[in-house]
Amino acid sequence: MSVCQTNPLNTLVSKSGYRFGQPNQHQQSIAQQQSRPRNNALDHQFSQFTGASGPSFAHPQHQQLPMAAVVANATTAASTTSNTATASDHHVWIDQFANMQVHDKTEFPTDYKQMYSQYEARGASYSMGAPVMVSHSQMFPRHQQSLMVNQLESQAYASSSAKLDEQFAELERQVQDDEKEQQQDKDDDFHLKETSPLDEDQRQLKEAAQSIYTTLSDKSSTTSSKFSNSKFLGLMRNISDGVITLKKNPDEDKYTELYSPSTGETFGEEYFPVQDSVLGDPLDSIGDLSNMSSSEAAAKVYHNSV
């Protein structure tokens, strides 16, 4: 893309054929007539000839012209004067038009022209095999640079604001978690006060759960990472806090399951008690097997069991 440098005024004047500062042909002819030397002898003879020839050859200024001729002469003189004035106005208008300066509002700005000239120079240099290094500040106008700076500042401000928001949100979550834990502890203490005191078996279970929870939750222990999120460790904590304990069956007067005294909710599977008894040694009825081989001893044990 290139900018046209042709002046439209010069084109218009060249087509009209008018040359500024030079006299026209009418003025040149009048000047030539005025510059010619006059021959007084010829003028005197011509005046005598016209006088001797009678009234038909009299000087035009002494002739009696009819009224129509007078009106025609007056009209011709007025038309000549009007044409002269019009021509003079026409020349003045051309001079004014030639001196007039036109400012095109749609013309490209100076910064853009400069940048485009650098772009053309750069393209020419690339075609010649010698690239021209153009700085980043010359490739972009100043207003675009200011827009980029403002955009970078806005992005930095938004990033810092987002980080601060995340930090505040994390602090709020920690505060809420602490408040929930404190409220949970208060509720647990309240429920423990409302429930009936523990009997001997429930107290022993609570002490055992406290010992297990203290051992497994120790950070220095090698097994702490394995039990940190286990349900078993959570159950031991609830038993040690008194939230969960043994439930006794009033009909059998035995503990059958785990439950929460505050809510009455049952935890785990149903408990089935196992009767404690000692079984006799099955080898007492077989006798001595020391003198037998392994196959004979196995056959004897099998027959006795059947």
Curated annotation (Swiss-Prot):
One GO process term, biological-process aspect: protein transport
Keyword vocabulary terms for this entry: Cytoplasm, Peroxisome, Protein transport, Thioester bond, Transport, Ubl conjugation
Keyword Protein transport among UniProt keywords: yes
Modifications after synthesis and translation: Monoubiquitinated at Cys-4; acts as a signal for PEX21 extraction and is required for proper export from peroxisomes and recycling.
Cross-link (Glycyl cysteine thioester (Cys-Gly) (interchain with G-Cter in ubiquitin)): 4
Region of interest (Disordered), ranges: 172-203
Cross-referenced InterPro entries: PEX18_PEX21_C
Protein location: Cytoplasm, Cytosol; Peroxisome
Highest taxon, organism lineage: Eukaryota
Disulfide bridge map: none
GO cellular component: cytosol; peroxisome
Predominant location category: cytoplasm
TM helices/strands, residue ranges: none
Signal peptide: none
Keyword ATP-binding: no
Function as written in the Swiss-Prot or TrEMBL entry: Mediates peroxisomal import of proteins containing a C-terminal PTS2-type peroxisomal targeting signal via its interaction with PEX7. Interaction with PEX7 only takes place when PEX7 is associated with cargo proteins containing a PTS2 peroxisomal targeting signal. PEX7 along with PTS2-containing cargo proteins are then translocated through the PEX13-PEX14 docking complex together with PEX21.
Family: Belongs to the peroxin-21 family.
Assembly with partners or alone: Interacts with PEX7.
Name assigned to this protein: Peroxisomal protein PEX21
Species annotation: Kluyveromyces lactis (strain ATCC 8585 / CBS 2359 / DSM 70799 / NBRC 1267 / NRRL Y-1140 / WM37)
Upper taxonomic lineage: Eukaryota, Fungi, Dikarya, Ascomycota, Saccharomycotina
Gene: PEX21
